[in-house]
Amino acid sequence: MFKRIALVCALFSGVCFAEGKQLLDKVVAIVNDNVITSSELNAQVELSKKQIIAQNMQMPDESVLRKQVLQHLIDVDLEMQMAKQNGITIENAEIDEAIEKIAASNHLNLSQMRDEITKQGISWQEYRQNIRKEMLISRVQQKAVGKDIIVTNEQVEQYLKTSGRIENSNLTYHLKNIVIPLSEEPTTKQLQRAKIEAENLLNKIKKGEDFSRLAIEESSGEFALEGGDLGERHLAELPEVFAKEVVHMKVGQVAGPIRAGNGFHLIKLVAVGGENQRHVITQTHVRHILLKPDASMVPSEAIKQVNNIYRQIQSGKDFALMAKQYSLDAASAVKGGDLGWVNPGELVPEFEKTMNSLPLHKVSKPVKTQYGWHLIEVIARRQKDDSEAFKKQQVRQFLQQRKFVEAVQNWQQHLRSQAYINIVDKDLA
């Protein structure tokens, strides 16, 4: 640490020269033991400008944009430091898998994906590094607060009772927001100052100033550099203080200031989407015979026996009788191997994939899963309207996401309060 600080002190003058009078990178901020350099800031500013242009937003003043980008880099650096302290790493194979999913979601192969990234002026190596950072930050956030995110059945029912009827749970709200930050324990004076600042911004918006540009210039929120765009969120995903407001807002309306844990917010309702849809699932009535290696049966014997049972069934032996005689799944064996009606996702993937591909009353060849070797027969299929259970599960997921976002914001606020942050370039302070 002392060596790093000594180096930083040598750079405080702003311009230093190496051997041969080569201009060195200027330090613009110190974050604990790390530094953020001018070149890092410049690169992120240029990237932000491209994003602002691509989204057809008004370009903010250069000096204001640089300040906002620096604050973003400080937040990222703090979370990357936490990832390092916790020994969190991302393997190259994980990055490859993530990029493949991104490409597939955009209907591109990897070659086309690489071309698109290059067209945006980003090298493939830079893109991979950005993906690595995003994954590291996601993982460290999950480690920091994920274990504390619990949503009970009672909370789901209470939400549906008081905030969102089941038939409306599919609606989405496209929001933008501006955050005027507060410390963890603000004084009365700090509260008043932040509220006045938020009210002044609201007045500017009412007079016609662009919400997105003001978000880029003034907001401390995670999405400030995207014009404060939160995207489309279901009601249960929104902070409760937002949800109470948004259901009464008209498209285009701006509400606030709204007091939340991390500051005062202004929110703009951009659009309302989604519609009430029925959710229908295919249930499968299935039975199986399970053989698995154990102390009395080595793997080769289990494979030999399951193949022998398969041949006997193919020759006309009764499946239920064979299950009662040979299956090692005690719970279903007494019922002739019958597992009853199962929903999608209830069985292990290898079993379900084979089951879904089988015609009715046809017995599968032996299928290997973590439990052993299975013979599978589909007895019947039916369609079931699962809308109520599905939407309750959606609400549970949305409430989990709401709690997670709020917990992450509090954690980020705490990280900042505990960190040593020195903005060396006073033009950026």
From Swiss-Prot:
GO terms for biological process: Gram-negative-bacterium-type cell outer membrane assembly; protein folding; protein stabilization. One of its GO terms (molecular function) is peptide binding. Residues 170-271, 281-380 form the PpiC domain. Its EC number is 5.2.1.8. It catalyses: [protein]-peptidylproline (omega=180) = [protein]-peptidylproline (omega=0). Residues 1-18 form the signal peptide. Keywords: Chaperone, Isomerase, Periplasm, Repeat, Rotamase, Signal. It is an enzyme of class 5 (isomerase). The keyword Repeat applies. GO terms for cellular component: outer membrane-bounded periplasmic space. It is found in: Periplasm. It comes from the Bacteria. InterPro entries: OMP_Chaperone_SurA, PPIase_dom_sf, PPIase_PpiC, PPIase_SurA, SurA_N, Trigger_fact/SurA_dom_sf. Pfam families: Rotamase, Rotamase_3, SurA_N. Its main location: periplasm. The PPIase activity resides only in the second parvulin domain. The N-terminal region and the C-terminal tail are necessary and sufficient for the chaperone activity of SurA. The PPIase activity is dispensable for SurA to function as a chaperone. The N-terminal region and the C-terminal tail are also required for porin recognition. Chaperone involved in the correct folding and assembly of outer membrane proteins. Recognizes specific patterns of aromatic residues and the orientation of their side chains, which are found more frequently in integral outer membrane proteins. May act in both early periplasmic and late outer membrane-associated steps of protein maturation. This is Chaperone SurA. It comes from Legionella pneumophila subsp. pneumophila (strain Philadelphia 1 / ATCC 33152 / DSM 7513).
